[in-house]
């Protein structure tokens, strides 16, 4: 079994106000697969992603990342293997420059300055915005912010990449690159 597998087994989630977001969801995503989840607004897509990241805990069922069941004890190690790009890039970008935002995670992981620079440069090139490295996020378009948020996660080199509305705000060329 691949250590990159994601598995949900009979997962349900109800918000504290009683609104049921997910009911008895089961699926497996294997290493190398790309999966898109489609649904109407309010259908539970973002809730599902928050459950996968351990931000929310299922009311019933279980989530496994690789062969490890997600529990409060395993969550810190699981989170190191997952990268989440939020639906709204403004929730993710908070530093004074795009470079600083993309470098934030690798620096907090205590990587060397040389490794941080290498990862930031590579991530910015991957999403096509190396020319924006010195620009403050508030001076970027929605698509540029989206690309910067994706670069910030790519710089962490997660085993699993989870994207909430990954192509919103991106132009057609940037969508193909993403």
Predicted regions and their residues:
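Conserved ABC ATPase signature
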Residues: 136-140, 144
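The feature captures the beta-strand-to-loop junction immediately N-terminal to the Walker
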Residues: 38-40
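Conserved ABC ATPase "signature" region
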Residues: 114-132
């Amino acid at each position: 079994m691949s250590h990159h597998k994601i598995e949900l087994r009979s997962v349900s989630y109800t918000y504290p106000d009683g609104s049921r977001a997910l009911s008895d969801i089961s699926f497996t995503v294997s290493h190398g697969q790309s999966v898109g989840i489609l649904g109407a607004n309010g259908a539970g897509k973002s809730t599902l992603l928050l459950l996968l990241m351990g931000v929310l805990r299922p009311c019933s069922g279980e989530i496994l990342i690789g062969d490890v069941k997600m529990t409060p004890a395993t969550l810190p190690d699981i989170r190191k293997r997952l990268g989440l790009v939020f639906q709204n890039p403004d929730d993710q970008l908070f530093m004074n420059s795009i470079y600083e935002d993309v470098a934030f995670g690798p620096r907090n992981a205590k990587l060397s300055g040389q490794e941080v620079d290498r990862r930031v440069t590579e991530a910015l090139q991957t999403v096509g915005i190396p020319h924006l490295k010195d620009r403050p996020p508030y001076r970027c378009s929605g698509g540029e912010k989206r690309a910067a948020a994706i670069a910030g996660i790519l710089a962490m080199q997660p085993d699993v990449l989870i994207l909430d509305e990954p192509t919103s705000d991106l132009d057609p060329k940037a969508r193909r690159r993403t």
